[in-house]
Amino acid sequence: MAKKIEAYIRLQVPAGQANPSPPVGPALGQRGVNIMEFCKTFNAQTQGLEQGMPIPVVITVYSDRSFTFVTKTPPASILLKKAAGITSGSSRPNSDKVGKVTRAQLEEIAETKMPDLNAADKEAAIRTIAGSARSLGLETEGV
């Protein structure tokens, strides 16, 4: 028989840097999950990724206090800001442009994000990422 699911916990944790301090500790502690076990397995799983890159994770907590987790791809906004070489988006994205991204950069980001996007094909994924870029105040070339 399958275990009974008690809760889903959604967090953004820096790759390879999970530790018991907030936000990880309190979120898992109130559900009775072994925090150090999560930190060790998460850090091992995200070891190959760029250190410090925020990784969304969905933790499924079961009634016997065991857990499983699924890591997602980094948020599109972070990948776009990194590609454009900026630290934050525009406060007025329609009028103030803060940077540029090329079609090649959009394709690369779309390829990375494809497992998490609900796009039918690569072209639709590129258009989705281009929309995110425009909402950050980035100019999109070739889209």
Curated annotation (Swiss-Prot):
A Gene Ontology cellular-component term: cytosolic large ribosomal subunit
Keyword Oxidoreductase carried by entry: no
Superkingdom, taxonomy of origin: Bacteria
Gene Ontology molecular function: any one: large ribosomal subunit rRNA binding
InterPro entries in the record: Ribosomal_uL11, Ribosomal_uL11_bac-typ, Ribosomal_uL11_C, Ribosomal_uL11_C_sf, Ribosomal_uL11_N, Ribosomal_uL11_N_sf
Assigned keywords, A-Z: Methylation, Ribonucleoprotein, Ribosomal protein, RNA-binding, rRNA-binding
Transmembrane domains' residue ranges: none
Pfam families on file: Ribosomal_L11 (PF00298), Ribosomal_L11_N (PF03946)
GO process terms (BP): translation
Family membership noted in the UniProt record: Belongs to the universal ribosomal protein uL11 family.
Assembly with partners or alone: Part of the ribosomal stalk of the 50S ribosomal subunit. Interacts with L10 and the large rRNA to form the base of the stalk. L10 forms an elongated spine to which L12 dimers bind in a sequential fashion forming a multimeric L10(L12)X complex.
HAMAP family, alphabetized: Ribosomal_uL11
Protein name: Large ribosomal subunit protein uL11
Encoding gene, per UniProt annotation: rplK
